[in-house]
């Protein structure tokens, strides 16, 4: 959605066709119910600053990088609102404070060191640290309600957001579909990708009728979430050799009790649980979804072999295994047994056990106020790194062929939050001529004023 809209603004003469397997748009991991909507800015996610160094400090370079990238997303979306590409911004972004919360003496010292490192940078100058329960109760009363004695601490920054990535995606795609030379086709699955002398032949099957057609394109972008890896493998490009995918399912606890929901106005991230992947670090989130304020806790990870929540099949993982990635996937199983056991345990635990995890954040939680829902599926990119197979990559990665005729996005966190920065990477690499001209540069500056600046 972001790439199509940005390319069309850079060069209105471009013809752009989008295909979506689902009947609706942005129904998988982008949908508001299928992700945390944090607007990852590095403010509260402790997994980006996982440990203290030998001198007691905490490295904050990663959170600074993510914050800068998310600023680019907000700039582009602001441009979209101002230029009638996305109306009613409160339908997709709302201000919500971001809080990091820890308990235990060691973690309190860690958070204090994290705050010292982050608040020294101008991005996070407004961040506040406290160990005072009265102060914390004024920030997020559910965290203190019913809590026993013991060291606790939190940081808070009011500049955080809650983002409905599905809503902004659908708004941008709606605008794109109305532009000359552009089309949006949902209910269409790509079943073939073959290189030709001028670019690519894309075979597409319409789900409702079974009709198959072939389109030709000079450039193809694969941004299909968990469905990206099979399409990338289908392309046959050398850059896809050895790549694998490791799907991780997700579930939320959701509370619609208005009395409880109104007590909480923050996104609260906690400490990573043992063996948990980064996208499964627990958090208690205020969400604005479908015009309604609600409260989500999770995510709880789960074992799955599907690559997509709605359009996926249980054969996705086995069918993705090829001779060139078999050793990588085997090594994932061997060297990440704790992770595999964790996923199986998470997916089979009882509601009582889930509520016990929730009580780490909200000690007074009652099971009757919460229900379990399924969330999206994250497919982690797996590849060989430094000669060692079986490394799970929890970030996002753009794979581009040598001819710059096809790009694909793999990975998850921080994902949608830095989508505009990812789009910039694709444009710089695959469409350099669009930025080389004075006119193109000016158009990009209008969309993202800091795109060529280092604001760190």
Regions found by a protein language model. Give the residues of each.
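C-terminal catalytic lobe of FAD-dependent flavoproteins
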Residues: 150-159, 167, 309-436
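Core beta-strand elements of the Rossmann-like FAD/NAD(P) dinucleotide-binding domain
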Residues: 208-219
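Dinucleotide-binding Rossmann-like beta1-alpha1 core, especially the glycine-rich loop
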Residues: 37-138, 294, 304-306, 312-315
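Short beta-strand to alpha-helix junction loop
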Residues: 61, 65-73, 102-109, 155-177, ...
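Flavin (FAD/FMN) cofactor-binding and adjacent substrate-gating region
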Residues: 87-96, 101-179, 183-185, 193-198, ...
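Flavin (primarily FAD) binding-site architecture
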Residues: 222-238
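Central beta-strand plus flanking loop segment that forms part of the substrate or channel wall
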Residues: 41-43, 239-267
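Glycine-rich FAD pyrophosphate-binding loop
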Residues: 8-32
